[in-house]
């Protein structure tokens, strides 16, 4: 890929593919739709979908509004995330995250899915916010929503969700919660990142206020399952516990989190505390968090959770946290919660903890503590805790509030648990210091006030008396007022005389304390008691009379109703008022009571007669109270009270109320009697259901003896109450009908009519249902009918026509009506008595209503009534003609006798059918009354007479149900007379004050709607003629409905119904002029109505079917105000002429917008008419204020819809339709949408009138370039594309006919094409490419793709053309444009561009310009613009070549391009291009073009170039060869083996020449080697020596490295084929390594090359070669160790030990000669690796020489010291040698190794010992080597080598005394010996050392303490003897050994030499450090006998050291002062 292409690709938006795939439509994955459906939705349709969903969510969640502007607005449609900065993207991510979390609640709603679809398609949240998306969907993991989103997400590997969900994406499906739980467990996710993410979900949701039920359910269940798994598994991971605790605590402490959030935490929290033994700190954090206030949690739930986890914690003493007491005080109803928990679960342990915290501040918890401590089942432990703490706190506090709280609680506690409190008191007295805080005895004693309140409620009478007095005294002092009132109120109901007397002892005080309401409430139970005590009532009456009523006379009515009423009635068992008590009602304050002032004497008289006169007295009192009520000023209230008492549970009050009301019904007259009776009936009606009163005897309207006896003797019996009910109902027969006419058949009666009508109907109901005794029912019915008289039939009609009347009642009414009609003739006043039958036709509509009744029996009786009114032709007067409907009766239209008779006879003919089917009557009228062909005028007159008769009753009968029934009869009758009759009724509804309107307004909305709908139903197609009648009201009525100036309650409903009729066919039946008038009125109505009503009207207008001829005429009428000619006829002249054009525009908009133009028949005259609107608008554009743009757009849309369907061009021409108006509108309008629609029209007209369009094509496209190209919306570009696709082909066809060749065609099209290319920089970026692709396809890609691309490239040559874009951005467009077409077109463009390049380069030296792009250069352009044109075309050409690379191109075209480019390359030597990049770019282009050749051709061209080309061409061809060769398939290479061999041969020649082509040649060979096939190995082998040879000829390190790297590849590739060249490779590599001038990289590569030879062919490397390699590598180790070590490892692994070891022996000689320590270390490292990698089977045969070699090596110390080498160097070398020896030992078994070790021992100890002194230096050196080896063995093999200490032990026993005696003085040997012994003690583990051996060796070891004292000890390097003795002590626990060791060392501290004493103390210190615990028993002798002396040593250093030892001992034992005294 070229550098330009790389730059273009790097800056391309990731949205490019999506935006260009369908010209702006979104592509890719979709949440809602399958891929095939998703691809059909563009960005606008997805946005509309999202908008609808967002609007719905906004109504559900107003908080969604915050995302509207940024995510769901028009601006969001243009957001491209790929071009945003990082900061902008981060901000957008945060917004998207919040939005997704809020959408989480609505995922299951379709509205939520729409919003998510938008975020997926627009913001790619499924790729760029995948974590937030998954978090939002996780709560729905088991629903279908989850797999739907999972299937489209792209999860990055860095996401915590990757491991869990990435494997599920391919086959997404709902997943179980167990899968998620497993994924977040530490077994799957050790980092716990996913767990932390899920655990924080709720916290984040609370923070943002987006908590929802699904989230909480998921979170809780997941946490619970996770903990359950831990509970049943291996337990919870520490990290899991930490995360969960933090999460739970944070949520519990979150302010205002809410009840649901907190409830979600409790289950996993409890499970956590039960599963994991939490440490104190996290447990305390949980407990404290549970007490956090202000979280919005349910206090009961939270406290119960706290109690559960506290009760589960077996030992908890840290309380509840720092602020627990204060927080507990904020818990609502804490006491009740604790008591409930105690009752159900006990929770004794937890309760103790909570109560203890509350007791810290009892004043804050006084109420809650009292509730808990007063509980009857309080645990003893809580009682004891509370007693102790309260006593202690109350005694020690200075706060009076706290002390009072403690005292109150303790006092109550002591009453319930005296022994526990007393015990606590005694214990507190004993424990508290009496002087400071003596226990306050008063804490457990109640205050006098509390005693008084307790006494008030005591069972003992004397206590209650005392308590009452005390409470009154306290209240008088102002203490405890509320409590006092409560206590005294309770005692008012006391039945003991002494207590009552105590209450009234101070009446004034009692009045001051008790409010009147409280007093009445307190004393009321006494008066209403079942068995009241008369003398107690007397006491109360005295107080009320003498004091209460005197002070509060206003309370009289309340006292009468609440206290006195139930005591008036006397029964056999209840005598509340004796004579003496009754007399009290005559005196004092009772005199002032209204009712008692008049009935007082009667009460007294009633009680004087004693028991015998009690029954009579009750009646007397009742009548007296009735009379008092009659004269009362509060009559209505009194009646309400009496009726309420009918429900009283106290029989006395209930029966007394019945008696009083009975008396009132009989006594009252007029409205009061009627209203009272109605109230009683309303009360009784629902309460008598299920009761039967028929068996009650002696029941009548009078109160008889039986009734009063039942009241006196059996007041509680139900039968007594029923008798009272019957009696009062019987009294209703005395209610008198109001004077005057009552309109029975009306729904709008006056108040008196309504009351009596209701009363009469109720009485009729009672009289006809089988509940009352027969005599009572007959009496009531007779009384009612007597008063009704002739009105009875109308009354019966009102009953059977009422929908509320039960079926039996309707039947009774019809039967009574039948009887009335038969009996009416017998009345003396009846016309029938004079021989004239009565005409009952006025009730015929009511009979028709009954015939439609739902009950069959009703219909049957109705038929009988119908027969009874049939009569003959000569009927007399009409019954109730003037009274049936009251004032409206005159509107009733009567049938003629003939018509009446015929109508009834016709009905009776099918009467039985009416009985069977209630709907038959309607069908009958439909059959009879509809117009029928063949009927004469007489029949029509009869039919219309009946319709008029029925409609007149509809108009007169002002009751909704009858009207609806009658109208339903005519609903299917089609006759104009119905509409004529209905119009006056409808028109009256325009006036809200009319009677009809007022009546209808009083009805429920449902009935209003049915009525209006029934009337408007008469507006049908069949009755349209009524609307056209001269002088008729119909048409005016319709137009008035459209008059917005008229306001009425019903006009809107009428208008809607009229619309329905119009749409239903009425409009189509109108005359054309009526249609026009109606539509104009409708349009004007739309503009005047409110928005909602206007929308309804618009919908109607849209549905009206208007024919084209009417449309044309309508357009003329509506356009009149826009015409400029003053002579044009106007339909209407308005006052405000200047506003008429604007108004006309609005009306035209409404009209044009209402038509569905695609469904209207296409008509050229109609198009011309619409064009006339545009012409008129052009003239009025300046004076029209608004709407003109929209109208133009809609008109263009209409024209477009019509023109698209017109196929006859001649029709358009005949209608004189032209394009000039369209062009004028385009030029005049500034609205882009108008111009767009105009362009669409122009594009359609191009098909019909092409010549006219071509004449105006340049203005069209100039406008497009200046305006539409700069807008970014799908519609605009749809318009542009359509315009281009229709007009451009017309233009190009004309140009092609004029051009002779492609260059001429380009030149002639230059101006036309420049319109588009000049605007490329101003187009919206993501729409630029789709447009040009469409443009080129419309032009023809084969002809115009090349010139369009050339012009687009030419834009980059000037700043103006680039339009502030960078060059790379400008060149991106043509490159992407070419990419949209197939290979053949691209190849063709490639050839055209090469030709243009040739023309441009030729024009550089010509005066007459030939090139196409030269025509774009002007005189003002810069002189270098032609060079820039060439440069940018070359860059563009590179882009094309990049797109064609690897594609199958036309070889002929490519070869032609290559030939032309070669010619051009030769011509770039012109001076004008010498300083530019053109030559090099041209060569690159040539090379890229060559890549388009096939592999065969490519290899052939390469071979030719290597033979004939220039050096630069060879370099280029080799580079291309190296780059492209790996792309050739193996089967093709197999075919080209000879060519490749020839190429390699030529490359070998180039390498031999070592010219400038070497580097390129090496790369070419390297490319062949890396991808070679087997058949090419021979050719590669032939070139290998040349490659090796060239290394010595070149000087450049980079080339040397490349050559060596190639040699390495060749060696590894060719393997055995490289054997002949091993020596040359090794020589070259070793020479390079030895070179001191070579760069490190070359040396490194030389080592790599050597390694490749050793690894590939190790068996073919000779010993001599190996020796050279070893020596060179060992020498190089001085310079750098890494390469040497790597090569050592390779040699050791690849060369067999048998072959390598002799070479090592030989090399050892050379290394020794050099004598360098570095070389020796390197040698021994090589030896170690050799032995490490040696095969075990090879060692036995080599063991003797190897061991001999090591013995020789071990003598190296001696030889090196003879040379004066530094000891440290000697030690390092020896360490290296020993390391090698240890590798050998690792390979040996014990039988093999042991003899070798013994031989090593002999070598070190015996071989040189004969005849020499023991202090011989060389012998000492060998011993040092032996001990070094032993130390290494012990370190490496631990106790496995301990037994070998037995071999050394005899010699050790010799050496230790020798050192002690001074015969041996080698400090290194001494140090090493002690270290070996110490190591042996350390690792032994019982393998060698025993107590006996240790004891044996102990004296010799201790004897070493005084030796080599100059060695100063330090923590890092202690004295060897001290370490050795410490290891000895640490290796044993035997007391004998430790005692001997301790004693021996302690004895050494008594040396005279202070240095020795110090050394001994150092050893002693190390010994106690190592085994202090086992030596505790040695403390006495060690401290008292030795350390005590040393602490007083004369040497300060000794004293300090002794104190140090003592301190170490005291760490184990504690203070040892007693041993030192």
From Swiss-Prot:
GO terms for biological process: maturation of SSU-rRNA from tricistronic rRNA transcript (SSU-rRNA, 5.8S rRNA, LSU-rRNA); positive regulation of transcription by RNA polymerase I. SMART domains: BP28CT. The lineage of its organism: Eukaryota, Fungi, Dikarya, Basidiomycota, Agaricomycotina. Involved in nucleolar processing of pre-18S ribosomal RNA. Involved in ribosome biosynthesis. Gene3D superfamilies: Leucine-rich Repeat Variant. The gene is UTP10. It comes from the Eukaryota. HEAT repeats lie at residues 837-875, 976-1014, 1281-1319, 1935-1973, 1977-2015. This is U3 small nucleolar RNA-associated protein 10. The keyword Coiled coil does not apply. The keyword Ribonucleoprotein applies. It is found in: Nucleus, Nucleolus. GO terms for molecular function: snoRNA binding. Component of the ribosomal small subunit (SSU) processome. GO terms for cellular component: 90S preribosome; small-subunit processome; t-UTP complex. Pfam families: BP28CT, HEAT_HEATR1, U3snoRNP10. InterPro entries: ARM-like (IPR011989), ARM-type_fold (IPR016024), BP28_C_dom (IPR012954), HEAT_Utp10/HEAT1 (IPR056473), U3snoRNP10_N (IPR022125), UTP10 (IPR040191). Keywords: Nucleus, Repeat, Ribonucleoprotein, Ribosome biogenesis, rRNA processing. Belongs to the HEATR1/UTP10 family.
